[in-house]
Amino acid sequence: MFKREEIIEMANKDFEKAWIETKDLIKAKKVNESYPRIKPAFGKTHPVNDTIENLRQAYLRMGFEEYINPVIVDERDIYKQFGPEAMAVLDRCFYLAGLPRPDVGLSDEKISQIEKLGIKVSEHKESLQKILHGYKKGTLDGDDLVLEISNALEISSEMGLKILEEVFPEFKDLTAVSSKLTLRSHMTSGWFLTVSDLMNKKPLPFKLFSIDRCFRREQKEDKSHLMTYHSASCAIAGEGVDINDGKAIAEGLLSQFGFTNFKFIPDEKKSKYYTPETQTEVYAYHPKLKEWLEVATFGVYSPVALSKYGIDVPVMNLGLGVERLAMISGNFADVREMVYPQFYEHKLSDRAVASMVKLDKVPVMDEIYDLTKELIDSCVKNKDLKSPCELTIEKTFSFGKTKKNVKINIFEKEEGKNLLGPSILNEIYVYDGNVIGIPESFDGVKEEFKDFLEKGKAEGVPTGIRYIDALCFKITSKLEEAFVSNTTEFKVKVPIVRSLSDINLKIDDIALKQIMSKTKVIDVRGPVFLNVEVKIE
């Protein structure tokens, strides 16, 4: 914490001096904890749920009430709604099936089998019979069966399961039997039930909407069809309702999603639950995508179907696929990849890859960590010294109860060179999925690489790590290791950089996997000609 009174006193005496000197009180984060290796943490919504919420709000703004329609629909309702067309429609429905409950008796043979497992049945026979009978009658749930058998025989649940497997094989041989109940394949099957019940409960006209899941037995799933999808559907019931209401609702709803201009084209399908010549496809123009898109269907329910549900006023229904709208809004090409991204390839952005490039070794001790900055500054300042030359830094550290005198000598003995090589100030960038070392200046860079490197510097994501930075951390990290191991001297020599590890850098496996799979590159090659000798006394 700051010593506020001292700072104020210093500022009162000499504000400029206090302003400059107090900057050291703001400690910089360590390299692996600095930007871009730190990222803001936030959650992420799903595009389908985003679209559902946007549709909900759009319907509510238009004065609709939200309802949840039944998901499980008896096939009789499909016949009532579709008439003779029902058989063809039911082909796309999923039927619900369940396992039958076998009539399992407790014969002498089964009692003998149980007793062979070392369990006395005589005292518990009646209790066991009651449990089996209760299961058959449906008064006992299947997931409680093992527990109840175990309790009745006063045995462990593991032994109860063994009895079920070995003595009562009837349970293993069960085959599901289909019922007459179906999973809703479209929202209409639910609207007839809902509107029918509300006819004597709500004053006419009324406007309802529901956004929920439907199930359709597609022959196969592809880039535009799934076996389960969300329908955003509405129904308006009242005298005078006709297809003009459908047109107005379509425009009012879809204009809230950026669509302009609408075409209403008669649907060739002519479903029997709609009044003839009312089933209509809605095409809308999206100025961003610059194309006309089919986005919804509406129609007026047939008086024949309505009458079977006790409904004696017109009902207009409009529906659209949520996933379809989400694909348009998010510019997705494949509904499967949009809905289930976890099962498809995930592409990391350059920003994300940059956050995964880190120093491999970093000293833990603050004093040694702070030495790194001094070492970096000295190297940058003296990098162009003409050889033979050397740069020496001496420091004394307290390590436990001992003093460590450290002498770091950076040198170049060969004549006609600089203290450090030309790539020493290269910085690591991530550009178009590639991890590359980009020089401070493009003087002397071959023309075949120049354009790519210039674009990388202008458009890529800088990691903020130069070769000299990472290498100096390598030196100070080895110095710390030498303190711990009581080593008195060591050398660091890096002539040519060929890989990240040569400059004390590492990259997360996730990023590395993407780079390899996308045939991208990690290219950090360059001459640094670093020669270091460190002595500790």
Swiss-Prot record:
The keyword Cell inner membrane does not apply. Substrate binds at H186, M187, T188, S231, A232, S233, Y273, Y274, N317. Keywords: Aminoacyl-tRNA synthetase, ATP-binding, Ligase, Nucleotide-binding, Protein biosynthesis. One of its GO terms (biological process) is translation. InterPro entries: aa-tRNA-synth_II, aa-tRNA-synth_II/BPL/LPL, O-Pseryl-tRNA(Cys)_ligase, Phenylalanyl-tRNA_Synthase, SepRS_C. Its EC number is 6.1.1.27. GO terms for molecular function: ATP binding; phosphoserine-tRNA(Cys) ligase activity; tRNA binding. SUPFAM superfamilies: Class II aaRS and biotin synthetases. PROSITE patterns: AA_TRNA_LIGASE_II (PS50862). It catalyses: tRNA(Cys) + O-phospho-L-serine + ATP = O-phospho-L-seryl-tRNA(Cys) + AMP + diphosphate. It is an enzyme of class 6 (ligase). It comes from the Archaea. The keyword Nucleotide-binding applies. Catalyzes the attachment of O-phosphoserine (Sep) to tRNA(Cys). Belongs to the class-II aminoacyl-tRNA synthetase family. O-phosphoseryl-tRNA(Cys) synthetase subfamily. Homotetramer. Interacts with SepCysS. This is O-phosphoserine--tRNA(Cys) ligase. The gene is sepS.
